[in-house]
């Protein structure tokens, strides 16, 4: 059994509007966060060239359906069925309680633009799937869209996302332990093929 998971394409754009190669790919999420602990950052989120919101927060996540059960979930984002054609924009610990996660069609282009606050810029970094952090400066931006590539997952057993959620989140009708078949024999088709460790 196989399924195709959507990915995100990320390009850093300089203040002159020129994209800085190479583009990067993320399976779960792209995070734009503060570089220093104890400081909040300011940034704009734009959707297809229109301002969505100005955030004063620890950062912002853009996640795929696959990533909705990862960092995005911890930040208060929604749970999304893996095959849904959407992306989620979720603020991390926003200063305003009215700032909530937004679910968008995956054909939209998202731009995250760092901002100064009272003439000062607090340094930020961005990362993909929690890997290496890359610095970003004021005047630069991240352009995020659905990638043309997908990631193929092979399951040796039929997967049930509802059962996975019940087990992982300990909902009623679920169990505190891993249900049989949860990620058993899961392979990623890519640069190498190897079983993922059971969780």
What are these regions, as identified by a protein language model?
Residues 1-58:
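Catalytic core of DAGKc-family lipid kinases
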Residues 12-14, 34-36, 64-68, 93-94, ...:
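Glycine-rich beta-alpha junction loops
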Residues 15, 19, 32, 48-51, ...:
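ATP/nucleoside-binding phosphotransfer catalytic cores, i.e., glycine-rich phosphate-binding loops
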Residues 45, 67, 126:
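Short aromatic-centered micro-motifs
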């Amino acid at each position: 059994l196989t399924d195709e998971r959507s990915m995100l394409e990320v390009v850093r754009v300089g203040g002159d509007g020129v994209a800085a190669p190479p583009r990067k790919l993320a399976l779960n999420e792209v995070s734009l966060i503060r570089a220093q602990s104890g400081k909040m950052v300011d940034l704009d989120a734009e959707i297809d060239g229109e301002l969505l919101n100005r955030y004063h927060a620890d950062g912002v996540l853009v996640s795929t359906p696959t990533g909705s059960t990862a960092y995005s979930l911890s930040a208060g984002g929604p749970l999304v069925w893996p095959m849904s054609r959407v992306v989620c924009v979720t603020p991390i610990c926003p200063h305003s309680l009215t700032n909530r996660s937004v679910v968008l069609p995956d054909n939209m282009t998202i731009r995250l633009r760092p901002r100064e606050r009272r003439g000062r810029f607090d340094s930020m970094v961005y990362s993909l799937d929690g890997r290496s952090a890359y610095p970003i400066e004021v005047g630069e931006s991240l352009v995020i869209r659905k990638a043309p590539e997908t990631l193929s997952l092979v399951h040796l057993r039929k997967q049930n996302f509802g059962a996975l959620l019940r087990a992982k989140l300990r909902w009623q009708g679920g169990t505190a332990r891993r249900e049989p078949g949860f990620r058993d024999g899961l392979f990623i088709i890519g640069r190498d093929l190897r079983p993922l460790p059971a969780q």
